[in-house]
Amino acid sequence: QRQMCIRDRYKEKKGQVYTDNYRSALSTDRYILRGDAAGETYEPRFTFHGFRYVEIHGLERPLPLEAVKGIVLESIGVRTSGYETSDERVNRLFNNIIWGQRGNFLSVPTDCPQRDERMGWTGDAQVFARTATYNMNVDPFYTRWLYSVRDNQGDDGSYANYIPVVGFPPHGA
């Protein structure tokens, strides 16, 4: 029985991998290969990962790069802005912001898609809201999430630090 293992990894410097910020998240998928000579496709169905690099091992030979495909999941879509300068570093920064928004706007506005919790932190969502509205058509996304904010308002008028409230005391204000 052959098993392929896929791990998300953040590579900070050449040859160095940093995963401490994952906390308890393993960010590891294991797939038992059928042994199909024509090839196999693996796509996780009940999880998602935020990553920059992936590590695949357990195969007899390395996969060619074109055989590996990342799929972007997001709850927004239509980009409403563009930005380009003569400085490629600034262009890269803007594109990284767009990718960060796409990776963190999946059902609720999260602060990081790679860790062991993906909660709709109200402070992060509020701070980034203006930028988000310039970048993409987020009206339906924020409208739906703000209904959840209202639905989760405490009897005393307080709001939780994250919405929806799940599993932990909300420690709201």
What name fits each language-model region?
Residues 59, 127-138:
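Well-ordered alpha-helical scaffold segments within catalytic/enzyme domains
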Residues 3, 7-114, 123-124, 140-143, ...:
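Extracellular/oxidizing-compartment recognition motifs
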Residues 1-2, 169-173:
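Short, intrinsically disordered, charge-balanced linker/junction segments flanking boundaries
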Residues 127, 159, 172-173:
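Extended, hydrophobic alpha-helical segments in both membrane/secreted and soluble proteins
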